[in-house]
């Protein structure tokens, strides 16, 4: 279950961002949601990622934060026929050009795992 390591990385990154805001004198009340960009070839289960994040964030300011993700399809470039487009398979080992069925291809992307942004609630009364 590699979702645990990804969820832990997300939690640590958000907690670091919260700490930075608090060092600037801003009081963080809660983290509402976290938007991610996840490549299809990472084989991450969003349901498992959300479940694990919920468990490990239980005693933090991120408790109850919703993980949202945009799944990113890998791009393919065929060196033989020069086809370029989205790849529909999730198995990197079975990749062939959809136009000429060549295996002489290059993959671009699909392995991303990025935090795009997070919605953080601040105490504005200070």
UniProtKB/Swiss-Prot annotation:
The keyword Zinc applies. Ni(2+) binds at residue 2. InterPro entries: HypA/HybF (IPR000688). Zn(2+) binds at residues 78, 81, 97, 100. It comes from the Archaea. GO terms for molecular function: nickel cation binding; zinc ion binding. Gene3D superfamilies: 3.30.2320.80. The keyword Cell membrane does not apply. GO terms for biological process: protein maturation; protein modification process. Pfam families: HypA. Keywords: Metal-binding, Nickel, Zinc. HAMAP family: HypA_HybF. Involved in the maturation of [NiFe] hydrogenases. Required for nickel insertion into the metal center of the hydrogenase. Belongs to the HypA/HybF family. This is Hydrogenase maturation factor HypA.
């Amino acid at each position: 279950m590699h979702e645990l390591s990804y969820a832990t990385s997300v939690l640590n990154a958000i907690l670091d961002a919260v700490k930075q805001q608090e060092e600037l004198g801003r009081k963080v009340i809660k983290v509402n949601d976290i938007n991610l960009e996840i490549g299809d070839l990472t084989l991450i289960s969003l349901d498992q990622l959300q479940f694990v994040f919920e468990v490990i964030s239980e005693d933090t300011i991120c408790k109850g934060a919703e993980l949202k993700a945009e799944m990113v399809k890998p791009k393919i470039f065929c060196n033989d026929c020069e086809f370029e487009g989205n790849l529909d398979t999730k198995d990197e080992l079975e990749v062939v050009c959809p136009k000429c069925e060549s295996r002489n291809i290059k993959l671009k992307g699909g392995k991303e795992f990025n935090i795009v942004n997070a919605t953080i609630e601040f105490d504005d009364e200070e």
